[in-house]
Amino acid sequence: MFTDEQILNWRKAAQIAAAAREFGRSLIKPGARLLDVSVAVEEKIRELGALPAFPAQISLNHTAAHNCADPNDATILEDQVIKLDCGAHIGGSVADNALTVDLSGKWSELVKASKDACLAAGKIAAPGVCVSDIGKEIDDVIASYGFKAIRNLCGHGLGLYIVHTGPTIPNFDSGDSEILEEGMVIAIEPFATPGAGLVQEIEKANIFMFAHKRPIRSP
């Protein structure tokens, strides 16, 4: 499906994305400015030899994901639950990863539930495994902590210059019969919540993607 060079680029991009993620963790502390952390993480990705696969995103508290700071964002990190999502690519081979930091000190079990679910799912992900079985594993681990998996957020495949593609990796037993195949690249993305297990779109969009060129119209 992919060339040896592309696979090598994927491994390098994943290492850089992970290093940038951990660098971001070191910056997440009370008094830090959200926008400064986002910019620093993207700069770290470039410094390490890759390009950001998408804008670094920092989501706070009830906002589960996909919050991207605008240039005028003056949000200061305080006692929130903070999710950092960043990605890197080399030659189009895209790596996507995230972490959660609990500055409030109140949600350590919630953070652990998501992390353990991700690790457990990663252990069973292999060619021939049904995506619903991965979702069930995620749901079971999160439920063991007394939380719910968010069902309308999911993991996904990664392609060349494509951040989101098939297969969908659910966070529960969705009944999807799709099987992982040799050569697929996937991102497993568990989300644990003390709430109902569903999210709503409530924030404005700050992330845009180039679709195609269009000719300039004459007056």
Give the residues covered by each predicted segment.
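Active-site neighborhoods and metal-handling regions in enzymes and metal-associated proteins
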Residues: 1-219
